[in-house]
């Protein structure tokens, strides 16, 4: 009985005593949200909004967080320097397109933020632990906040397109995001279903995924210039070269391993370019597929896998194809230089992506 009485009194206080009363706020006689009305048959008459709330600054930031909190996973990864190959590529193509600095800055920011957002999602989907030698963002901020920051970046850059002032930019941006997700979907399917793609399927995935941001950068630049030159084949080649080299270096380079995590593609179960070649080179041997299924972090096992890929000639195959693709790319650049003028920037990027053959002298 006493419990019921106390509960009733507490409910009455919560409903009918002004909020300000508990904060030392002294309301005027009319400052009540509900007033006793002796003339009403119900005894009480609701009078909402009779009293204005005390004039205080909004506390919204306390609950939702300022922009810095929403962006925190993005800014964390942005603070860790990467290769910035996309920024170099934008500068290189601008030797031909000649955009002013303000227009170029928009393209650079859109590409940089989209790339960073895609890395945040990739690291979650791949179960990565390191990115550029530091703990991945979702290990620091949590998965939910990291996903939210990545999605926020997509829409933030979509809004930025209005500064370009060309309706084609939105269409270009949308197509690029669709391509990125198509490529990522193919990559994830092969890994999760443990299905080894053909080399042709892999190249198609790379054109969607890695080449997608390269194409987006160039097309956003072109809508702001008077250029009608078709750069698509060159951009496609650059994307393929970049990704094959990235796959190669993940398994071969000690410096790269220190920064990203030793032979991380094997831990992720990824069908990278040398892995695909090795599996198809000896389909009767299931060792490499078995190692990928394990998602192992054991370096001894991963080194064994790398040695096996050496035995199937897979790394040599990567080097030979990279040399062939680079030769094609340089040929395209020289053809374009006839009408557009010299472009030292793209040649410098191809030099940067060069992988030495055994016994080859380093590029000067």
Curated annotation (Swiss-Prot):
Isopentenyl diphosphate binds at residues 83, 86, 115, 132. The record marks 154 as: Important for determining product chain length. It is an enzyme of class 2 (transferase). One of its GO terms (molecular function) is dimethylallyltranstransferase activity. It catalyses: isopentenyl diphosphate + dimethylallyl diphosphate = (2E)-geranyl diphosphate + diphosphate; isopentenyl diphosphate + (2E)-geranyl diphosphate = (2E,6E)-farnesyl diphosphate + diphosphate; isopentenyl diphosphate + (2E,6E)-farnesyl diphosphate = (2E,6E,10E)-geranylgeranyl diphosphate + diphosphate. Pathway: Secondary metabolite biosynthesis. Mg(2+) 3 binds at residue 246. Dimethylallyl diphosphate binds at residues 131, 209-210, 243, 250, 260, 270. The keyword Metal-binding applies. PROSITE patterns: POLYPRENYL_SYNTHASE_1, POLYPRENYL_SYNTHASE_2. Mg(2+) 1 binds at residues 122, 126. This is Geranylgeranyl pyrophosphate synthase janG. It comes from Penicillium janthinellum (Penicillium vitale).
């Amino acid at each position: 009985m006493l419990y019921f009485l106390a509960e009733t009194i507490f409910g009455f206080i919560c409903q009918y005593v002004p909020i300000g009363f508990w904060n030392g706020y002294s309301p005027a006689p009319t400052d009540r949200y509900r007033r006793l009305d002796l003339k009403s048959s119900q005894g009480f008459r609701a009078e909402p909004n009779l009293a204005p709330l005390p004039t205080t600054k909004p506390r919204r930031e306390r609950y939702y967080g300022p922009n810095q909190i929403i962006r925190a996973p993005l800014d964390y990864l942005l603070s860790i320097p990467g290769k910035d190959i996309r920024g170099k590529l934008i500068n290189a193509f601008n030797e031909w397109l000649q955009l002013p600095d303000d227009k170029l800055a928009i393209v650079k920011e859109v590409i940089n933020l989209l790339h960073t957002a895609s890395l945040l999602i990739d690291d979650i989907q791949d179960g990565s632990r390191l990115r550029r030698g530091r703990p991945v963002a979702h290990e620091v901020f949590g998965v939910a906040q990291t996903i939210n920051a990545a999605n926020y970046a997509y829409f933030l850059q979509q809004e930025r397109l209005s500064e370009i002032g060309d309706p084609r930019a939105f269409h270009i941006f949308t197509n690029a995001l669709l391509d990125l997700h198509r490529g990522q979907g193919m990559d994830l399917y092969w890994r999760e279903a443990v299905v080894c793609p053909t080399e042709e399927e892999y190249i198609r995935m790379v054109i969607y995924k890695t080449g997608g941001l390269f194409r987006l950068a160039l097309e956003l630049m072109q809508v702001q210039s008077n250029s009608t030159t078709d750069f698509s084949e060159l951009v496609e080649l650059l994307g393929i070269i970049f990704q094959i080299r990235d796959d190669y270096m993940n398994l071969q380079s000690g410096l790269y391993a220190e920064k990203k995590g030793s032979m991380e593609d094997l831990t992720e179960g990824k069908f990278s370019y040398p892995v695909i070649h090795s599996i198809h080179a000896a389909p009767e041997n299931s060792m490499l597929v078995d190692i990928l299924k394990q998602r192992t972090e054991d370096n001894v096992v991963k080194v064994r896998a790398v040695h096996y890929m050496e035995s199937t000639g897979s790394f040599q195959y990567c080097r030979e194809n990279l040399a062939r693709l680079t030769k094609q790319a340089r040929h395209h650049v020289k053809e374009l230089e006839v009408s557009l003028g010299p472009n030292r920037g793209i040649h410098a990027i191809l030099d940067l992506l060069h992988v030495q053959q055994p016994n080859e002298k380093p590029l000067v």
